[in-house]
Amino acid sequence: MKQYHDLCRHILDQGVVKEDRTGTGTTSVFGYQMRFNLQEGFPLITTKKLHIRSIIHELLWFISGETNVRYLQDNGVRIWNEWADEEGNLGPVYGSQWRSFPRPDGSSVDQLAQVIEQIKTNPDSRRLIVSAWNPGQLEEMALPPCHLLFQFYVADGKLSCQLYQRSADTFLGVPFNIASYALLTHMVAHVTGLEVGDFVHTLGDAHIYHNHLEQVELQLSRDPRPLPKLNIVRDVSSIESFRFEDFEILGYDPHPHIKGEVSV
């Protein structure tokens, strides 16, 4: 995927050295955008192998509204373990905000359900937005949302999605985020009777941690391979009804995995 390689090279060539919350140190740029035509293939990075199981199960977990890591652990996904408390709780993170964003009167808003209904009934709306950024609950969250707001757009029978990500760990996180929101776009398009359009990924602080510099150079030395295809194997009518087994990734032929440590 040339778009991702261009981002990595841009950070290495134009970035500034910044300190960060974890103490690792980063090279960073501010403000960057990538666009992926989902008709041309499913945007899974091919210059290193990604753990597809984690991508799918994490998104299903978000959609369920769950905020305890037990479901993830039961399905062999460990990516949230570092932030969970002893009981596995993370506080009101992504799934909570997507499915039960609190109102001042104590009730809540199911943002995802509302947006899907609006796509069906008012597809030209400019309010097809889901936000995970809730200033009143940030201190209760194990980790404030990095990918914090997404907006859908319908044109010519196709559904596009734009994500705003305030903080982007370019080596470990961004490939995962691209695939996750591309998958979400496919899922929402499926339940609303639309084709997929573009996924637009807008980054705020896009950075490479200094303990990932060698890995990024290795990845950039590899030639991208053709993108795989995503196939949804079952007719699903509601976003909550999707299961892991409903997705096939066809033709994914990546280069070997490149290990990198997570900065917590």
Curated annotation (Swiss-Prot):
Residue numbers binding (6R)-5,10-methylene-5,6,7,8-tetrahydrofolate: 51, 169, 263
Keyword tags: Cytoplasm, Methyltransferase, Nucleotide biosynthesis, Transferase
EC number of this enzyme: 2.1.1.45
Catalytic activity: dUMP + (6R)-5,10-methylene-5,6,7,8-tetrahydrofolate = 7,8-dihydrofolate + dTMP
One annotated GO biological process: dTMP biosynthetic process
Keyword tRNA processing: no
Subcellular location: Cytoplasm
Active site: 146
GO molecular function: thymidylate synthase activity
SUPFAM superfamilies per UniProt: Thymidylate synthase/dCMP hydroxymethylase
Entry GO CC: cytosol
Binding site for dUMP: 21, 126-127, 166-169, 177, 207-209
Top enzyme class: transferase
Pathway this chain belongs to: Pyrimidine metabolism; dTTP biosynthesis
Family the entry assigns: Belongs to the thymidylate synthase family. Bacterial-type ThyA subfamily.
Subunit structure: Homodimer.
Purpose of the protein: Catalyzes the reductive methylation of 2'-deoxyuridine-5'-monophosphate (dUMP) to 2'-deoxythymidine-5'-monophosphate (dTMP) while utilizing 5,10-methylenetetrahydrofolate (mTHF) as the methyl donor and reductant in the reaction, yielding dihydrofolate (DHF) as a by-product. This enzymatic reaction provides an intracellular de novo source of dTMP, an essential precursor for DNA biosynthesis.
Protein name as catalogued: Thymidylate synthase
Gene: thyA
